[in-house]
A protein has these predicted regions:
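Conserved C-terminal guanine-recognition region of P-loop GTPase G domains, centered on the G4
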Residues: 132-145
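Conserved beta-strand position immediately N-terminal to the Walker
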Residues: 8
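Beta-strand-loop-alpha "switch" segments that mediate conformational coupling across diverse proteins
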Residues: 160-207
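Structural beta-sheet core signal
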Residues: 39, 97, 120, 156-158
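Inter-motif core of Ras-like GTPase G domains
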Residues: 107-126
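P-loop/Walker-type NTP enzyme "switch/lid" segment
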Residues: 2, 11-13, 17, 28-102, ...
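Hydrophobic positions on the alpha1 helix immediately C-terminal to the Walker A/P-loop
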Residues: 22
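Long, low-complexity, intrinsically disordered segments
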Residues: 256-291
Length: 291
């Protein structure tokens, strides 16, 4: 369990790995757990802020689930001041930072050094793996340079995975990659490539996203709060409810009695999970895996 406010940074020097989508999806996941969230958009494209403005035009701003702030990460002093301010704000539980897909910005160093958790999404492909390995090596050298000041836990996420793609030699490389990356942090289960995982909203969550990310996000959530149950009771209303934005797929469920979701395990198999995150028949022994 980490003392809040907790800073979680989504980062990789390789673009196109789903970093921004995972950041927003995790924000929606945390809101459903009663967590007070602020999202800091430091990506050069500012996709999250653009999405928030679009969402406000579409849904209004009466019930925004969390604030989105936009910053340019080029100023080292400004970023240092920002993370210090966020770490001392009692009104915030978790800060999510979407960093740029580049290491050129000078303000990234104080962000990485002061993060409690760094989430590194990547693809199993011959272009992304070397770039991600280089980024992990950069973080490791930064940790050695600053010493105990950098305490970030690393969660390395194989994102947008397609089990149908890859020659036998490549699949062997994927396994070796997982083993190598585990020397730098915790390599989570795979998040599959699905259309729902390539779009996001800063106001309305997607039920279909939950099934793909819950097992991975539960691990990160547990590392922060030491449990998988909500930190506080929160009644989501209107657009904040996890109704699928696609009316052909979305299903309204009995929210007064709790919601049962379909989650994906590491092998891509589906299983029912209660709103708290664990499957209904999880044993005490299995629960210890979150520790």
């Amino acid at each position: 369990m980490i003392q809040t406010p907790v800073i979680v940074t989504f980062a990789n020097q390789k673009g196109g790995v789903g970093k921004t989508t995972l950041c927003v999806t995790f924000a929606n996941y945390l809101v459903a757990k009663g967590v007070r969230v602020v999202v800091i958009d430091c990506d050069f494209q500012h996709s999250i802020m653009k999405c928030r403005k679009s969402d406000i035009k579409k849904y209004g701003e009466e019930q925004l689930p969390y604030e989105v702030w936009s910053y340019e990460p080029n100023n080292k002093a400004e970023m240092t001041s920002l993370v210090e301010k966020l770490h001392n704000d009692p009104e915030i539980d978790v800060v999510l930072i979407d960093s740029p897909g580049s290491l050129k910005a000078e303000g990234l160093v104080p962000i990485f050094v002061n993060s409690d958790i760094i989430v590194v999404p990547f693809h199993y492909d011959l272009v992304t793996i070397p770039s991600t390995a280089s980024f992990l090596l950069f973080l490791d050298r930064l940790r050695q340079a600053v010493g105990e000041r950098m305490k970030a836990q690393l969660f390395i996420i194989p994102n947008l995975n397609d089990n149908r793609v890859g020659k036998r030699s490549e699949l062997i490389l994927w396994d070796n990659t997982r083993e190598t990356f585990s020397n730098y942090g915790y390599v989570t289960g795979k998040i599959p490539r699905r259309a729902d995982m390539e779009r996001f909203s800063t106001i309305a969550a997607l039920d279909m996203q939950y099934r793909y990310v819950s097992s991975v996000f539960d691990k990160i959530y547990f590392s922060i709060f030491g449990k998988v149950t909500p930190v506080r009771e929160v009644k989501l209303t209107g657009i904040q409810l996890t109704d699928n934005l696609n009316p052909k797929i979305g299903k309204k469920k009995n929210r007064e009695e709790g919601v049962t979701h379909i989650a994906m395990d590491e092998d891509g198999n589906e299983e029912e999970r209660e709103a708290g995150g664990l499957s209904a028949d999880t044993t005490d022994k299995e629960k210890t895996e979150y520790e």
